[in-house]
């Protein structure tokens, strides 16, 4: 299977799962990936979904930072793209960061996960508006 097709299948599975909660622009959430979270079967990684209400044209930066695992982010929009924005290490080594201009108004799903199989541990998820904020502190795990 082509890599992007596998990603589309994974994201369709994720979109059917429960959301952990809602995060707004300007918010920070501290939580943990556990073995009780949603499992992305192709990668055997745990994941959480967070709902974000976005406006067309709004620029946001989404940061996922962890000292316990190599953070990975996906963003599913109201008009799901076959190539959704994703990131592994733009936040500095093992932290993930997405900065983008939202193409549509509606509910987005932020998928917080790891690039490592069965990884668990604490993380911080932050959504900011406007220009890209300063770089995250380097991962120290």
Which residues fall in each region the model found?
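Sec-dependent signal peptide recognition
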Residues: 2-10
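Non-catalytic extracellular/lumenal accessory regions of secreted precursors
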Residues: 12-59, 85-88, 93, 126-141
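Mature, folded catalytic cores of secreted/periplasmic enzymes
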Residues: 1, 39, 62, 105-106
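Short proline/glycine-enriched turn/loop motifs at strand-loop junctions of beta-rich domains
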Residues: 57, 66-70
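Noncatalytic accessory or regulatory domains flanking protease catalytic cores in secreted, cell-surface
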Residues: 54, 71-126
């Amino acid at each position: 299977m082509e890599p992007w097709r596998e990603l589309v299948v994974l994201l369709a599975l994720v979109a059917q799962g429960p959301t952990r909660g809602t995060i707004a622009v300007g918010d920070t959430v501290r939580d943990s990936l556990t073995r009780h979270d949603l499992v992305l079967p192709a990668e055997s990684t745990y994941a959480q979904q967070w709902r974000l209400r976005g406006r067309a044209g709004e620029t946001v930066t989404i940061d996922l930072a962890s000292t316990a695992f190599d953070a990975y982010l996906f963003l599913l929009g109201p008009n799901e793209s076959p190539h959704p924005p994703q990131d592994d290490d733009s936040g500095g080594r093992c932290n993930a960061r997405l900065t983008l201009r939202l193409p549509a108004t509606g509910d987005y799903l932020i998928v917080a996960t790891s690039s490592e199989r069965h990884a668990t541990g604490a993380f911080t998820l932050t959504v900011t508006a406007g220009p890209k904020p300063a770089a995250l502190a380097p991962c120290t795990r």
